[in-house]
Regions:
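Intrinsically disordered, low-complexity basic segments at termini and long loops, enriched
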Residues: 1-17
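Conserved active-site regions of diverse hydrolases
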Residues: 13-396
């Protein structure tokens, strides 16, 4: 299957959809399991990690196997005991590397694949849960795959987790302890790219109406998480969708699609303004929270414009796939796979390589704000103890 994108020039952009995926069948999640793994896992990890837990929401940029399992060559560079995986990459993804920056081994496990074994790993120090689902979007009708789980549903899953945690924590002062745990945890959100892909492919409204609708829905999700106890938000903005191989392959000379990138930049600015108002206006429900917006757009455009300085040699072509720029046919078991994956920006027609995720996470986490990769603070400052007081958080 392919999505057809009409542009305002003699070109047609074909965005291949995912192939060869299967739905995860292990959905045995019990109230006790969730309560124990989140509460205890976070507490045991607090001594060595920068936050007690990480809760991940979004799309394939941070999905670690919520609803699909991808066959090789996806995950080709992961340890053998890590397979199968739902990461849309040759290896680890952004959620993994941000979690590592926080002191964890990898991203927390996916909500619908928790087992007694994975809960044991969490009890040993990996706190939190991933609700992120590949192919999902901010809008409820943005579902690239039948198994994709919208951001709204992901937030509902967290609400269920919170309820189960509350039921488990019935002791004296348990409510305050739970509030403290959630306030000190990181809520990581990386979503919106698929919404833009579908809008570019088949716009059913003007760009401005689409952006306002997207922002309204995103704001609702942030507010719901805040109402459920989230106080520390790490937002990863929408990447430059106009520069992915699937778009470039149908644009003359393999260039980026300027209009697509323009409306993404505008939306990212809108999100930054919304978060600023949400966190500082005393009349807004989010007063008292702290946040950082990481610009995946600026990070990837920096890699694209100055690849050599960032360790890349190929920034237009997909590492795995066939046809022009490796993007006319999706990555599958018999596809051509590049050998130098560490120097490729893109893994397949629309997703980054492990190398891109690792370098991008390091920049979002550590780069000075003056370099315009994060605002108003970077992720390291977001989880710094000195941010607890300014954001209304208690120290761990």
């Amino acid at each position: 299957e392919q999505l057809t994108v009409q542009v305002d020039r003699p070109a047609t952009i074909l965005i291949p959809t995912m192939a060869g995926v299967r739905v995860s069948s292990d959905k045995g999640l019990t109230a006790l399991l969730v309560a124990v793994l989140v509460m205890c896992g976070g507490r045991l990890a607090a001594a060595s990690n920068l936050v007690p837990a990480v809760y991940v929401f979004g799309d394939s940029t941070v999905d670690v196997g919520m609803n699909v399992t991808l066959p090789l060559p996806y995950g080709i560079d992961l340890p053998h005991d890590f397979l199968p995986t739902g990461r849309v990459s040759n290896g680890y993804n952004l959620a993994d590397y941000i979690s590592r920056q926080l002191g964890f081994k990898n991203s927390p496990p996916p909500y619908l694949s928790l087992t007694p074994h994975t809960s044991h790993q969490i009890l040993r120090g990996l706190g939190g849960v991933s609700y992120a689902s590949g192919g999902s979007g901010i809008l409820n009708n943005t579902l690239i795959m039948e198994t994709s789980i919208s951001l709204a549903e992901q937030v509902k899953f967290f609400a269920d987790t919170k309820l189960q945690m509350t039921q488990y924590a019935r002791g004296k002062d348990s409510g305050a302890a739970l509030d403290e745990l959630l306030a000190e945890s990181l809520f990581l959100i990386s979503a919106g790219g698929n919404d833009f892909f579908l809008h570019i492919a088949n716009p059913d409204s003007s760009d401005s109406i689409f952006q306002e609708n997207l922002l309204s829905n995103f704001t609702k999700h942030v507010q719901t998480l805040y109402d459920l106890g989230a106080r520390r938000f790490g937002i990863v903005g929408v990447p430059p969708v106009g520069c992915v191989p699937a778009v470039r392959v149908r644009v003359p000379f393999g260039l980026c699609l300027p209009h697509a990138n323009k409306i993404v930049r505008e939306f990212n600015s809108m999100v930054g303004e919304m978060m600023a108002n949400f966190s500082t206006d005393p009349e807004q429900p989010g007063s008292g929270m702290t946040y950082s917006v990481g610009s995946s757009y600026n990070v990837l455009m920096n890699f694209t414009r100055d690849p050599t300085a960032n360790g890349f040699t190929v920034v237009r072509r997909a590492c795995c796939g066939d046809g022009l720029l490796g993007a006319e046919n999706p990555c599958k078991h018999n596809s051509t796979v590049c050998r130098n994956r560490a120097t490729h920006l893109y893994w397949d027609f629309a997703h980054s390589t492990q190398a891109t995720a690792e370098k991008g996470a390091a920049i979002i986490f550590n780069a000075p704000v003056e370099e315009n990769f994060t605002a108003p603070i970077n992720f390291q400052q977001l989880v710094s103890p000195r941010q607890h007081g300014s954001g209304g958080f208690s120290s761990a």
